[in-house]
Amino acid sequence: MALTKAEMSEYLFEKLGLSKRDAKEIVELFFEEVRRALENGEQVKLSGFGNFDLRDKNQRPGRNPKTGEDIPITARRVVTFRPGQKLKSRVENASPKE
């Protein structure tokens, strides 16, 4: 099961007493700010959670799995996430849900 933006909005609605519209807008604004920072080449640091970084990957050789033809995989920028120590600890110590 995955946590969705709609579920995050619902949680804010229930726990903070915000209107559903305000809760949804807060979640959307949060993610829009994360996107904006990454688009501008900035690192996103969320204390106690982790860091979103940008990494440039060089061009490299690849292969079309259907034809076996060699094709270059173009250079690109990717987003990476490194969990913080608090998040790592909580995940390691959590009991698995079945």
UniProtKB/Swiss-Prot annotation:
Residues 49-70 are annotated as: Disordered. GO terms for molecular function: DNA binding; structural constituent of chromatin. Pfam families: Bac_DNA_binding. GO terms for cellular component: cytosol. PROSITE patterns: HISTONE_LIKE (PS00045). Keywords: DNA recombination, DNA-binding, Transcription, Transcription regulation, Translation regulation. The keyword Transcription regulation applies. It comes from the Bacteria. One of its GO terms (biological process) is positive regulation of metabolic process. PANTHER family: DNA-BINDING PROTEIN HU, INTEGRATION HOST FACTOR SUBUNIT ALPHA. This protein is one of the two subunits of integration host factor, a specific DNA-binding protein that functions in genetic recombination as well as in transcriptional and translational control. Heterodimer of an alpha and a beta chain. Belongs to the bacterial histone-like protein family. This is Integration host factor subunit alpha. It comes from Sodalis glossinidius (strain morsitans).
